From Swiss-Prot:
HAMAP family: tRNA_carboxymethyltr_CmoB (MF_01590). Keywords: Transferase, tRNA processing. Belongs to the class I-like SAM-binding methyltransferase superfamily. CmoB family. It comes from Escherichia coli O6:H1 (strain CFT073 / ATCC 700928 / UPEC). This is tRNA U34 carboxymethyltransferase. Catalyzes carboxymethyl transfer from carboxy-S-adenosyl-L-methionine (Cx-SAM) to 5-hydroxyuridine (ho5U) to form 5-carboxymethoxyuridine (cmo5U) at position 34 in tRNAs.
Length: 323
């Protein structure tokens, strides 16, 4: 059973304490009524993982944990088998006591693009919206963050996060809650808010930007990463039924249009930090994610287009400040 009590105790003593007015009831409702049919199977995999205290832990350059003495072949096999019970692994990679989880996405590449443009994360309280398995939260902790809170309603991601946390010595500096941004009150409590790979899934992208702003302290920093297309400040793609085989893609703006959207929502000091084409080296099928990936979503005769004929995925990172 995944227990959120440690998180409640933690925030009871800091500037997130007002969240306790609503959060425990939301989590109790989720536990009672909304759990996935496979959740018990996934949470059992977490429970059966060994308790290990890492001798060497690197969260600055990767997410790597090592023991003082090498684990036995049987111990490694146990960890690998239990972690494979939590497939598919989409965001990573993780290197845990000789078990190398080669995830669909090289999320470390995204972090390397984003990190140089961030304000110093040392001592910051961070919210990561749509955090997936929590890979980037661990990198935030490695960069000096005091606390990283992730929200993502996908329950497999929660179990993946808890599995990694257990193998990192039950590290309590990062926490994942099975909630969507729309379930959060306007906390106005986070120094930095990340939204990476979420905006294009929202039916109302400006509402999403307002929701992100409501989580920031004054002078707080927003880090927004999303799909974009080429064009001027008036260019926005509204795909038909699917984009790169994804059904739930609603709006893909140009980076300049996105900058205007942020301005309209009251953000300042808005800058386009990076624009990069997503490659089949960064997103691909692996032993830990065996179904279709980016190569299957692109036109086989023109990799500059999706199978639907739209421009192939390109992603931008924008940084902005809440005044």
């Amino acid at each position: 059973m995944i227990d959120f009590g440690n998180f409640y105790s933690l925030i009871a003593k800091n500037h997130l304490s007002h969240w306790l007015e609503t959060l425990p009831a939301q989590i109790a409702n989720w536990q009672r009524e909304q759990q996935h049919g496979l959740f018990k199977q996934w949470s059992n995999a977490v429970e059966f993982l060994p308790e290990i205290k890492p001798y060497r832990l690197d969260l600055l350059h990767s997410v790597t944990a090592e023991s003082e003495e090498p684990l036995s072949a049987g111990q490694i096999k146990r960890i690998e088998t239990l972690m494979r019970n939590l497939m598919p692994w989409r965001k990573g990679p993780f290197s845990l006591y000789g078990v190398n989880i080669d995830t669909e996405w090289r999320s470390d590449w995204k972090w390397d693009r984003v990190m140089p443009h961030l304000s110093d994360l040392t001592g910051r309280t961070i919210l990561d919206v749509g955090c997936g398995s929590g890979y980037h939260m661990w990198r935030m902790i490695g960069a000096g963050a005091h606390l990283a809170v992730g929200i993502d309603p996908t329950q497999l991601f929660l179990c993946q996060f808890e599995a990694v946390r257990k193998l990192l010595g039950n590290d309590q500096r990062a926490h994942l809650l099975p909630l969507g941004i729309e379930q959060l009150p306007a906390l106005k409590a986070f120094d930095t808010v990340f939204s990476m790979g979420v905006l294009y899934h929202r039916r109302s992208p400006l509402e999403h930007l307002w929701q992100l702003k409501d989580q920031l302290v004054n002078e707080g920093e927003l880090v927004l990463e999303t799909l974009v297309i080429d064009g001027d400040e008036n260019t926005v793609l509204v795909p038909g039924d699917r984009y790169a085989q994804m059904r739930n893609v609603y709006f893909i703006p140009s980076a300049l249009a996105l900058k205007n959207w942020l301005k309209k929502c009251g953000f300042v000091d808005i800058r386009i930090a990076d624009v990069s084409v997503t490659t089949t080296e960064e997103q691909r099928r692996t032993e830990w994610m065996v179904t279709e990936s980016l190569a299957d979503f692109l036109d086989p005769h023109d990799p500059g287009k999706t199978v639907e004929g739209y421009p192939a995925p390109k992603r931008a990172v924008l940084i902005a400040r809440k005044p």
